[in-house]
Each structure stands twice: as C-alpha cells, then as structure tokens.
C-alpha cells in the first residue's frame, strides 16, 4: 500500500527502508529531513510496503521492495511520473532507460589532485540561479525544482556547492554535494562549459570537493552512466554497485 509519509511511525519506516543503502540514504535522507512535514514541498515522500518512495515532478526514486508492482505502477502513472530510479529490477514490461553506476570515496580516503588549472579561482558560494540556468535553460520546470530544492538544502546544511571561475569572473565549472545525510554526501551536476572540456578542470574540481568531504568524515557517492565510468575510475573513485532508471510501461488502448 502506498502511504504518504506524515506520522512519526511512517517517518521511522521510511528511514528504516533507506538505512545503509548508498545513494538512497543520502538523497532520500535529505528529503525526509526537509520535506516530510511540508505539504508544499517539491518532493513528496511515501512508504510502499517496506520500501521508500520519493516523487519530484516527473521522476521518482524507489529504495527497497514495493511488494505489489502493479499498485506502484498505477500510483506512479496517476501522479505523472515518467522515470523511476531504483535498486530493484522491476517485473517484465518496465523499460530500462539507462544503467546508473554507483561510485564512491570512503570517509578518510584521499584522491590524487592535479594542479588547479591556471587562471581559475574556487568559488565556495556560487549562485544557484546561475547554475540552474546553465544546467536547465531548456527545461523551465526542472529549473524551478532544482532551484527551490537546492536553496532549501543549502540553507539547512544538507548540501554544498562549489564552482570555478575564470579571470573575468565567469563560472566555467561546477559540482555539488546536493544531498548530505546519514553520513553520506551524494555528488551530482558536475559540469564544465563545453568549450573548456578536456582541460582537466572537472578533474581538479570533483576530487577537490570529494577529498574535502571525505576528510570531514563523509562517505562520498555519485551515480554515472557507462560513458563516464572511465573518467571517474581514472580519478580514483571506486565502483560500488549498479542501479537502473526505468520508463513507465506503455499501456494498450
């Protein structure tokens, strides 16, 4: 049964479902802390049998076994979800959109860091609006969700975002720990301006933030697609597992 998280018992059940589950314990742990008691939140939280479910816009995250996949399918379709990221393999009929590979850096470990590219400076408080514009200029609904979610997480200590700027002050690269909870910091949105890619900019910024977080006692994680695995392994991150993002099943007429 799908139940919205509102009571203390439901919050405990949600927390139990994500405990010890890399990626989910950070992302959904942040969401539980920020949104469980906020009816106007951009992310809605549910328990599904012994699983935890977070729905934000047209995407959802599922941690654990929902039991009745047909009920879950109907619910996700009703609330407008188009893509589901999960640690489980759904029944036949769900369409795999992409495999997502989990990588990490354990607390206390240190990655080798190349020299900072010449002329660039580190910005520890970049404009969230500027980052949203760079990442989602063609998706205004995603822009709004990202901006609201990130500003709230930063204000409450559940996120940390950094950027690099060129001598003219323009942001040329960014990455962030957008979910920090339960001892885990989840990295995402690592981007460098297209004309500057291949110059080692992201290869400096990402390990720098990861080392900082690991040095503070955080286990650092992130998800990436197949095409990016070599890059992150070259930086020294260790593979930890694999999840999947699935599309909603098509229905007949």
Where do the model's predicted regions map?
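A conserved beta-turn-beta hairpin within the catalytic core of GNAT-like acetyltransferases
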Residues: 56-61, 179-188, 197
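Conserved GNAT acetyl-CoA-binding A-motif
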Residues: 77-88, 213-225
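Conserved acetyl-CoA-binding loop-helix of GNAT-fold acetyltransferases
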Residues: 67-75, 188, 192, 198-215, ...
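N-terminal charged segments
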Residues: 1-92, 141
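Short amphipathic alpha-helix that is part of the acyltransferase structural core
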Residues: 1-28, 99-102, 107-147, 165
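Conserved active-site alpha-helix within GNAT-family acetyltransferase domains
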Residues: 88-97, 203, 226-243
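Conserved catalytic-core motifs of GNAT/GCN5-like acyltransferases
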Residues: 96-108, 238-253
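A conserved beta-strand-loop-helix scaffold within acyl/acetyltransferase catalytic domains
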Residues: 40, 142-191
């Amino acid at each position: 049964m799908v139940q919205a998280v509102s009571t203390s018992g439901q919050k405990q059940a949600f927390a139990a479902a994500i405990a010890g589950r890399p990626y989910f314990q950070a992302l959904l742990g942040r969401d539980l802390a920020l949104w469980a008691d906020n009816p106007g939140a951009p992310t809605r939280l549910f328990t599904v049998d012994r699983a935890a479910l977070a729905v934000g816009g047209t995407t959802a995250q599922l941690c654990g076994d929902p039991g009745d996949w047909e009920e879950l399918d109907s619910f996700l379709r009703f609330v407008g979800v188009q893509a589901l990221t999960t640690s489980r393999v759904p029944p036949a009929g769900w369409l795999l959109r992409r495999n997502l590979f989990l990588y990490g850096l354990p607390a206390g470990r240190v990655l080798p860091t190349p020299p900072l590219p010449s002329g660039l400076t580190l910005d520890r408080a970049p404009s969230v609006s500027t980052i949203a514009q760079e990442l989602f200029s063609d998706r205004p609904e995603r822009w709004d969700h990202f901006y609201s979610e990130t500003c709230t997480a930063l204000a409450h200590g559940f996120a940390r975002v950094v950027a690099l700027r060129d001598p003219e002050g323009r942001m040329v690269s960014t990455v962030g720990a957008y979910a920090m909870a339960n001892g885990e910091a989840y990295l995402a949105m690592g981007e460098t301006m297209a004309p500057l890619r291949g110059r080692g900019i992201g290869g400096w910024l990402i390990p720098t933030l990861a080392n900082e977080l690991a040095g503070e006692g955080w286990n650092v994680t992130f998800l990436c697609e197949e095409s990016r695995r070599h890059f992150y392994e070259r930086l020294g991150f260790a593979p930890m597992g694999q999840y999947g993002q699935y599309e909603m099943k098509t229905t007949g007429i």
